[in-house]
Each structure stands twice: as structure tokens, then as C-alpha cells.
């Protein structure tokens, strides 16, 4: 039973849902959780596989009326952040993104609490930051204590 508010999802438009799903499965740890279709369009929910506790879902929505029209929402600096367990994970994603032509920010060490980051751009022009050793969860633990 829900006892307190929580983040659940962010929804972004997609001009080509299948291409976006393929991109997120290639360049992030996200996989399809659910797909839906109705008279207005299609949507897909993506999240980390089997993350049952505190999942966060990326909802991609392709409205039929906007099919084929890019609508970048998270750009040029606005972004979604994904933290990876290893620094090498950031480098591996950056290498694949560079080869695919979608690397926005080269991997770089930033001062604490930012950590080691790069950014990639999805098929709709949205920026996704990939990081390692970012201080977001550490700050939550420091301020509000463990779970």
C-alpha cells in the first residue's frame, strides 16, 4: 500500500515508437515493460528490468497525428539522468553512441557531486545523461538517512 508520494514516470513524445524503443534498448539499460495502442496512438513503458522496488518508468508516446514529427523536449541541456554501476559502462555507451552518431557530450570527469558523465541523444532529440559515481543517491542518504 502506498504510504507516501513517489516519482513514477516521465512521458516524452516519439515520432517513431519502434525506432525509439530500439534506441533505448541499445543505449540504456531500459527494456519494454508494457505497450499500448488506442485510437490516438501508441505508447510504451520502459524501465530497468525487474526493478520492483522504486521503479521509474520512461513513457514514450507516439500520437498518430504527430507520427514522423520530431518534438525534442529534453534538450539542449535539459536531460534525463541514468547512473551506471561502473565507469567503464559510461565509456562503452559513449563508444557505441559515437559510432552511431548520437553522442552529445564526450565522457568527462566533472566535480563532485556530478561524477563521470557523457550524454547521448535519442531519435527524437532528447538528451540522456549517462553517469557513474554521481552523488544523487548519496545526498539523499546523507540528508534523509537509509531506507
Predicted regions and their residues:
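A short local loop/turn or secondary-structure capping micro-motif enriched for an aromatic residue
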Residues: 65-69, 101, 136-139
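Helix-adjacent hinge/juxtasegments
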Residues: 61-63, 67-83
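Short glycine-enriched loop/turn motifs at secondary-structure junctions
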Residues: 3-6, 73-77, 111-112
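N-terminal beta-strand motif that seeds the catalytic metal site of vicinal oxygen chelate
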Residues: 1-21, 79-80, 134-147
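Short glycine-/small-residue motifs
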Residues: 57-58, 127-130
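Vicinal oxygen chelate
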Residues: 14-19, 80-127
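Conserved catalytic-core motifs of GNAT/GCN5-like acyltransferases
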Residues: 11, 31-39, 109, 132-141
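Core segments of cupin and vicinal oxygen chelate
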Residues: 2, 11-57
Amino acid at each position: 500500500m502506498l504510504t507516501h508520494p513517489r516519482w513514477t514516470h516521465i512521458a516524452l513524445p516519439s515520432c517513431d515508437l519502434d525506432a525509439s524503443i530500439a534506441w533505448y534498448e541499445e543505449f540504456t539499460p531500459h527494456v519494454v515493460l508494457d505497450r499500448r495502442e488506442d485510437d490516438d496512438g501508441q505508447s510504451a513503458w520502459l524501465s530497468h528490468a525487474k526493478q520492483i522496488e522504486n521503479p521509474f518508468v520512461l513513457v514514450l508516446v507516439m500520437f498518430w497525428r504527430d507520427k514522423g514529427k520530431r518534438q525534442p523536449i529534453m534538450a539542449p541541456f535539459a536531460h534525463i539522468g541514468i547512473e551506471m554501476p561502473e565507469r567503464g559502462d559510461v565509456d562503452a555507451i559513449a563508444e557505441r553512441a559515437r559510432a552511431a552518431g548520437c553522442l552529445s557530450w564526450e565522457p568527462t570527469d566533472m566535480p563532485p557531486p556530478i561524477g563521470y558523465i557523457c550524454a547521448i541523444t535519442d531519435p527524437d532529440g532528447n538528451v540522456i545523461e549517462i553517469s557513474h559515481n554521481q552523488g544523487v543517491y548519496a545526498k539523499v542518504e546523507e540528508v534523509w538517512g537509509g531506507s
